[in-house]
Structures are given as structure tokens and as C-alpha cells.
């Protein structure tokens, strides 16, 4: 009797302390339960907030805490094991892959959407069209005034505003035009700050992720769109009017400034990170991306304009 009582007490102690912790290295989460942290390119904060809101509604025992940071930091968080997932606009490079291989880890990358870079200006700026050739000159330092774009312009000095010097947007422009950014480009902190700056400075040209102004059901997106105008880009001599970053133009590649969005998962097993990746890639998760104004990886789209 005494032995049975002693064993019962020991079992209670194990359950009491084992419920809140686990042996070192043992999993504490499943695809639909537990708590993990992820790092997300700040450009996509509104989309991932929507994905997480629905995911958490479906799985009440799951908690995913996002950190919205510049892309470079998101990759670094993944390397440092301070984030289970990274949501970014590039795949791992060879050096990063080799680092993970040295740890016997083989992160999986999944394309979840196609994104676009939007160029925005002050609503009173009459220059609403720009060519790819002019953009190349602009970002290489050969063109630094609105009058060089259009001699009839009422504006002179031109300044370019990015969200962050370490952002995916700045990296995209550097790689797209194979150049370092000229001295008349400046960085604030976030995409929303870019919009705010452009809305209050007539001579500014902002470079943002299109999802900040493309969700017709999001009040913040609607308010942002009222503050600025979206430029049309002429890609070649066959394009006479230029195109804005509508979903269909992003999907068929006729809008020239597009990029893919990836989820990179460093889990070596099927944990909560894997569960969230599966959700985002599912029909429900892809519909959230479609609604945001981006192009989902697996669904057809239609043209919806900016108004």
C-alpha cells in the first residue's frame, strides 16, 4: 500500500513538471498545436496577419508569433534558429545552404505567391507614366529630376524613397538594374512610412510592395490608396500606355517589376511550422493571397484596377 502511494505521488510530480517542459531536444509542437516564432519580410505583414488570423481560428491550441523585419534580418533569424520559418522574396543562397548542411539540416522552400513592386507618387504629380529605360537611368544615377523625365513637369528635384536599406524591395531594385542605389535615394523604416512620406512630398517617388494598396476589402489599403497615385510602367516599344501592377498583369508577366514570395522552413520534422506552410499552400490560404491583390501560386486571377 505504501509503495503504491509512493509510486502515485512520483507519477503526479512527473506529470506536474513534465506538462510545462520537455527533455532537451524533444518536440513540444505538432502541425496544429504548440508555439513557435517566425520571421517575415515586413512588406508582407498585412497578408501574413490575415493568414495567421484564420489559422489561429482553426487551431486554437496553436500560437505562431511573427516578427516583421527587413528581409535580411528574416534570413538571419532563420540561420540563428530564432525563427522556425522565414517568409521572404528569395531562396537560400549556396553559402546559406552549406551552413544548414553543416548542421545536418535541409530547409525546404515553397513558392506561395507572386508579388509586384509598385511605384507611387504624390496625387498632384502629373507624371504618371515612366519607362523601364528611364527607371534604369533613375536607379543608376543618370536621371535625378522630374524635368528630365518630362520637360513640362512643374517639379524639379526627384527623390526616391524605400522602406529600409536592408529590405527586399531595395535588394530587388539593385539586382534588377545591376547597380548600387544613387545618393538621392533614401530609406525610412516601413512601407506605410514610404506612403506617408510620398503623400506629403510632391517631388518624391516611393517604392513599395503592391499589397499595401491592392486589397479592396482592407480599410488601411483603401486609405493608403487615397493618399497617393500608382505609376504606369512602359516595358517596351510595343507598350504605348504602360501598366499598373494589377493581378492579371503580374500573373502574365506584362508588368515588369515582379518577384516570387517563398516560405523557407528549417524544421527537420512535421512541427507547427510545417502545419502553417501547408495551410498557406492550401485552397483557403491561397484565397487569402488572392484577396490581398497578389497572385497565388496555384489559382487563376482576373484584372482588378486601382480606384
Question: Model-flagged regions — what are they?
Answer:
Residues 1-9:
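Bacterial N-terminal signal peptides that target proteins for export
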Residues 104-108:
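Periplasmic N-terminal soluble interaction domains immediately after the signal peptide in Gram-negative
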Residues 21-60, 67, 71-72, 76, ...:
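Exported/periplasmic ABC-transporter solute-binding proteins
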Residues 116:
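Conserved catalytic core of two-component sensor histidine kinases, primarily the HATPase_c ATP-binding
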Residues 9-19:
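Bacterial N-terminal signal peptides
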Residues 72-103:
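Pocket-flanking alpha-helical
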Amino acid at each position: 500500500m505504501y509503495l503504491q502511494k509512493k509510486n502515485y505521488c512520483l507519477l503526479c510530480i512527473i506529470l506536474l513538471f513534465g506538462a510545462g517542459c520537455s527533455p532537451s531536444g524533444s518536440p513540444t509542437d505538432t502541425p496544429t498545436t504548440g508555439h513557435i516564432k517566425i520571421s517575415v519580410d515586413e512588406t508582407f505583414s498585412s497578408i501574413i496577419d490575415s493568414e495567421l488570423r484564420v489559422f489561429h481560428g482553426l487551431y486554437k491550441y496553436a500560437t505562431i508569433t511573427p516578427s516583421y523585419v527587413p528581409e535580411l534580418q528574416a534570413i538571419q533569424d532563420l540561420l540563428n534558429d530564432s525563427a522556425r520559418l522565414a517568409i521572404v522574396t528569395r531562396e537560400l543562397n549556396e553559402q546559406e545552404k552549406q551552413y544548414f548542411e553543416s548542421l545536418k539540416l535541409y530547409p525546404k522552400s515553397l513558392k506561395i505567391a507572386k508579388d509586384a513592386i509598385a511605384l507611387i507618387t504624390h496625387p498632384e504629380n502629373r507624371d504618371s507614366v515612366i519607362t523601364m529605360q528611364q527607371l534604369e537611368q533613375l536607379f543608376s544615377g543618370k536621371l535625378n529630376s522630374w524635368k528630365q523625365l518630362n520637360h513640362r513637369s512643374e517639379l524639379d528635384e526627384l527623390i526616391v524613397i524605400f522602406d529600409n536599406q536592408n529590405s527586399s524591395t531595395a535588394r530587388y531594385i539593385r539586382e534588377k538594374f545591376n547597380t548600387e542605389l544613387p545618393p538621392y535615394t533614401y530609406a525610412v523604416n516601413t512601407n506605410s512610412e514610404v506612403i506617408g512620406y510620398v503623400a506629403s512630398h510632391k517631388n518624391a517617388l516611393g517604392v513599395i510592395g503592391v499589397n499595401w494598396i491592392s486589397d479592396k476589402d482592407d480599410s488601411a489599403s483603401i486609405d493608403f490608396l487615397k493618399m497617393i497615385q500608382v505609376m504606369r510602367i512602359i516595358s517596351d516599344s510595343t507598350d504605348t500606355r504602360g501598366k499598373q501592377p494589377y493581378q492579371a498583369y503580374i500573373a502574365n508577366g506584362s508588368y515588369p517589376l515582379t518577384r516570387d514570395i517563398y516560405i523557407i522552413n528549417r524544421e527537420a520534422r512535421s512541427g507547427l511550422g510545417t502545419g502553417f506552410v501547408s495551410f498557406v499552400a492550401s485552397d483557403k490560404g491561397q484565397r487569402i493571397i488572392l484577396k490581398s491583390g497578389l497572385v497565388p501560386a496555384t489559382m487563376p486571377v482576373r484584372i482588378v484596377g486601382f480606384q
